[in-house]
């Protein structure tokens, strides 16, 4: 650390700011005496606490350390967050497209039945219930559960055929099979 022109160390002055604690005696006579760390009387005492002196350089050093720490943490979070987003976005987009296709097919099935002139309200209710069930199950929170991904955040391979290179998402496959 370099000194500035008006620094107290160049002027051979003592630091201008000093904090002191009050001395409290615990009873009169024999006993513990003053509370340790209180050094009102004697600055030359070898048992005195140096932390009671506020040295301006310490404040500067402390603020630089803190700023460096905060900057480092922020930069690390930003870089790892961006890298995770870049790696996971394509896979998430594919899953989102599949979910959208499933929900669109269910809506189209409802509309096709209405166009064909089916007056059976039970079928409409069944299709509506099925669509609402799909919407609930295919919610983003359910689709992106950790159980569907390996430790590298790639979709797990099919349990039936581990030799294929195809990814497998149990929930999406369930609804794709229901569409057939």
UniProtKB/Swiss-Prot annotation:
GO terms for cellular component: cytoplasm; nucleus. Keywords: Cytoplasm, Nucleus. GO terms for biological process: protein maturation. Residues 68-108 are annotated as: deca-GX3 motif. Pfam families: Yae1_N (PF09811). It is found in: Cytoplasm; Nucleus. It comes from the Eukaryota. Residues 1-15 have a biased composition (Polar residues). Coiled coil: none annotated. Residues 1-53, 112-131 are annotated as: Disordered. Residues 39-49 have a biased composition (Acidic residues). Belongs to the YAE1 family. May form a complex with LTO1. PANTHER family: PROTEIN YAE1 HOMOLOG. The complex LTO1:YAE1 may function as a target specific adapter that probably recruits apo-RPLI1 to the cytosolic iron-sulfur protein assembly (CIA) complex machinery. May be required for biogenesis of the large ribosomal subunit and initiation of translation. This is Protein YAE1. The gene is YAE1.
């Amino acid at each position: 650390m370099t000194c500035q022109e008006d620094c107290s160390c160049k002027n051979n002055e003592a630091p201008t700011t000093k904090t002191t604690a009050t001395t409290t005696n615990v009873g009169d006579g024999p006993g513990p005496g003053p509370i340790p760390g209180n050094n009102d009387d004697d600055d030359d005492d070898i048992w005195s606490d140096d932390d009671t002196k506020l040295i301006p350089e310490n404040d500067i050093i402390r603020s630089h350390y803190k700023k460096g720490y905060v900057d480092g943490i922020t930069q690390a979070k930003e870089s790892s967050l961006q890298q995770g987003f870049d790696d996971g976005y394509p896979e998430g987009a594919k899953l989102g497209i599949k979910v959208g296709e499933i929900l669109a097919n269910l809506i189209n099935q409802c509309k096709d039945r209405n166009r064909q002139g089916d007056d059976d309200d039970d079928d409409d209710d069944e299709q509506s219930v099925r669509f609402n069930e799909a919407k609930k199950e295919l919610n983003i929170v359910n689709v992106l559960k950790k159980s569907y991904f390996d430790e590298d955040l790639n979709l797990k391979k099919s349990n039936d055929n581990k030799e294929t290179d195809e990814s497998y998402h149990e929930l999406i496959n369930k609804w794709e099979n229901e569409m057939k």
